[in-house]
């Protein structure tokens, strides 16, 4: 993170950890990061821990998933696909877990449309940066 913005990822290798090898993690710089880790919201959770109270959610932290409601989950997955912290976007079930939508339900349609939506958002943001 730089200046209150996600600017990439640090990737730890589980195989390296299991083998007890001393290998540094990979550092990847990126203009945007998408958390599509599903229910666990792994990337959003790390940001929440490192910069408490800064997420763009009603409670400024991960809202958590609500009970299963397939019909609602389909539409809310799309609505919740957005930027949650500068440079960090959420998609799929990570979006519902972050913004408090119902768990499960969006099996194919909502999940695919969520990925398409976040890709379009990033393309738009990248083209706006070039101007």
Residue ranges and their predicted role:
Residues 1-131:
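Residues forming the flavin
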């Amino acid at each position: 993170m730089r200046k209150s913005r996600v600017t990439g990822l640090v990737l730890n290798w589980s195989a390296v950890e299991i083998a007890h090898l001393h290998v540094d993690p990979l550092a990847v710089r990126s203009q945007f990061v998408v958390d599509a880790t599903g229910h666990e919201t792994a990337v959003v959770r790390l940001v929440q821990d490192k910069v408490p109270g800064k997420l763009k959610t009603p409670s400024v932290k991960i809202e958590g998933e609500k009970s299963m409601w397939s019909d609602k989950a389909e539409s809310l997955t799309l609505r919740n696909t957005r930027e949650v912290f500068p440079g960090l976007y959420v998609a799929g079930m990570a979006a519902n877990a972050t913004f408090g939508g119902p768990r499960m339900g969006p099996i194919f349609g909502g999940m695919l449309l969520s990925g398409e939506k976040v890709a379009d958002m990033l393309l738009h943001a990248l083209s706006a940066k070039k101007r």
